[in-house]
Amino acid sequence: MREHALLRLNGIVKEFGDFTALDNIDLEIEEGEFFTIVGPSGSGKSTLIRLLVGMDDVTAGEILLRGERIDQTPANLRPTCMVFQSLALFPHMSVGQNIEFPLKLRKVSPADRRARALELLDLLRLPRDYYDKRVSQCSGGERQRVALARALAFDPEILF
């Protein structure tokens, strides 16, 4: 194993009461590498990703990004993000508010949040006037692009 892989997991264990969902997982992902996690339902794929983005805490082991531990860093400060299978958008909010949400958590100024949201609308080929459109009024494909824009908003180092 290289000394400073992009992402390294050392001895990751995740337990839920008496149930061990992940048992001593070691993994190394290099810069620029694409990595796929496959397995049957209930095998721990989602649990692993939830640990990587900080939605759950590891029971044991460590997660390192470029050699620095991130498993004790709060989720809103980690340089990782995920697009949920269900998209997990806020239907009562506008497209712009959804995209800006992770930036608001990071205390980015309103002007900078708006500028980044508009930049991402352009990148993902959604009309700029969608900024004020309710997510509930978007098509399924448009919602997927909004979820991707939200995940890219703070320019994460790793996207799941």
Q: Could you tell me what each predicted segment is?
A:
Residues 69, 111-129:
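Conserved ABC ATPase "signature" region
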Residues 53:
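Helix-to-loop junction immediately C-terminal to a conserved catalytic motif
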Residues 38-40:
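The feature captures the beta-strand-to-loop junction immediately N-terminal to the Walker
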Residues 148:
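Hydrophobic anchor residue at the start of the ABC signature
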Residues 96-104, 114, 118:
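Short helical segment in ABC ATPase nucleotide-binding domains corresponding to the A-loop/adjacent helical element
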Residues 134-138, 142:
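Conserved ABC ATPase signature
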Residues 155:
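Conserved catalytic motifs of ABC-family nucleotide-binding domains
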